[in-house]
């Protein structure tokens, strides 16, 4: 399944100019951050290694430390932009991309049965109508307990643990340099 392609530009009061990063050591003007959120609540001892964590951070402390860091950056004149706001801005500017985004997210989560694809889409669309709320939920992940149960008679459903993550959280988003970096007028996605 192809990745989402979007060649337009989101229009808003904070209309983003093109990316143009030519130095890794020059003055920082703008930074993309993600404030730790509910994705940390879906970390479990069993998922730590897979999600590249050594320990489960305590959410209130992680948020407090993040806020202090973001305030230091702002105090130095750096514009702080949040990843979740950028994603919501794109989806609000191009509403037709919402379902394509959800389909791609479900595909990337490894959901292959049509039953679960529909259950997850219905769950997201019914419970997260606001674009930013929907983006935040995709970052947080989905636990099997959250979804309505259907009697599907599929083997995968019969052996599933009630605490199983159906869609894994993305706790590494607050290390925004790890998944991608701006180089010149492009982006390197790792």
Describe the role of every protein-language-model region.
Residues 10-13:
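Short, low-complexity intrinsically disordered segments enriched in A/P/G/S/L with frequent Arg
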Residues 16-190:
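The feature marks the mature, well-folded catalytic cores of soluble enzymes
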């Amino acid at each position: 399944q192809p990745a989402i392609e979007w060649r337009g530009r989101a229009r808003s009061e904070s209309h983003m100019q093109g990316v143009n990063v030519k130095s890794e050591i020059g003055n920082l003007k703008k930074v993309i951050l993600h404030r730790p959120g509910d994705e940390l609540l879906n970390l479990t001892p069993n998922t730590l290694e897979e999600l590249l964590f050594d320990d489960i951070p305590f959410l209130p402390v992680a948020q407090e430390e993040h806020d202090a860091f973001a305030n230091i950056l702002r105090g130095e004149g750096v514009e702080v932009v949040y990843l979740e706001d950028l994603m919501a801005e794109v989806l609000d500017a191009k509403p037709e991309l919402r379902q394509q985004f959800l389909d791609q997210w479900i595909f990337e989560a490894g959901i292959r049965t049509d039953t679960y694809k529909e259950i997850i889409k219905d769950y997201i669309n019914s419970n997260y109508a606001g674009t930013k709320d929907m983006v935040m939920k995709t970052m947080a992940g989905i636990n099997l307990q959250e979804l309505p149960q259907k009697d599907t008679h599929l083997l995968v459903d019969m052996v599933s643990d009630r605490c199983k993550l159906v869609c894994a959280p993305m706790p590494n988003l607050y290390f925004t340099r790890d998944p991608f970096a701006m180089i010149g007028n492009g982006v390197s996605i790792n």
